[in-house]
């Protein structure tokens, strides 16, 4: 069944920060159980079925090699650590995306989160999923 904005999820907000100067370089949300799982997702990629071609039972999506993820795989990535900004709790997926947007925008107002491609995950969800 397709994910919906009104689905109840157990999600939290994480951030990557530089160990050499404490700058926040990226913030995101996850429905993963641990912050380590979210880190592994970004650093190493994954093979979830939603990323398989439709002919093989997936949705045809591909793993996205964003600027952020590419940087994690470079020497620069060794200076980045992940941590919880908002501990996971039960909420709707829409509430999680709104919280993520708020946390990204507050950091960008301070000149941080410069590796976030978008400042509005909810807008992007609606754009790409048509909801």
Language-model segments: which ranges?
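Conserved short loop/helix modules at catalytic or binding sites
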Residues: 31-93
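Short amphipathic C-terminal alpha-helix that caps PH/PH-like domains
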Residues: 97-107
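Coupling/hinge elements of helicase-like and P-loop NTPase modules
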Residues: 108-122
């Amino acid at each position: 069944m397709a994910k919906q904005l009104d689905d109840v999820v157990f999600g939290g907000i994480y951030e990557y920060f530089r160990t050499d100067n404490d700058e926040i370089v990226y913030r995101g949300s996850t429905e993963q159980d641990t912050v380590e799982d979210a880190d592994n997702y970004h650093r190493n990629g994954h093979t979830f079925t939603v990323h398989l071609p439709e002919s093989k039972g997936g949705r045809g999506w591909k793993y996205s090699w964003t600027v952020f993820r590419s940087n994690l795989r470079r020497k620069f990535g060794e200076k980045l650590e992940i941590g919880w900004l908002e501990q996971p709790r039960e909420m709707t997926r829409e509430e999680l995306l709104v919280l993520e947007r708020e946390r990204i925008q507050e950091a960008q107002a301070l000149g941080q989160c410069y590796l976030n491609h978008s400042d509005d995950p909810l807008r992007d969800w609606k754009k790409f999923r048509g909801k």
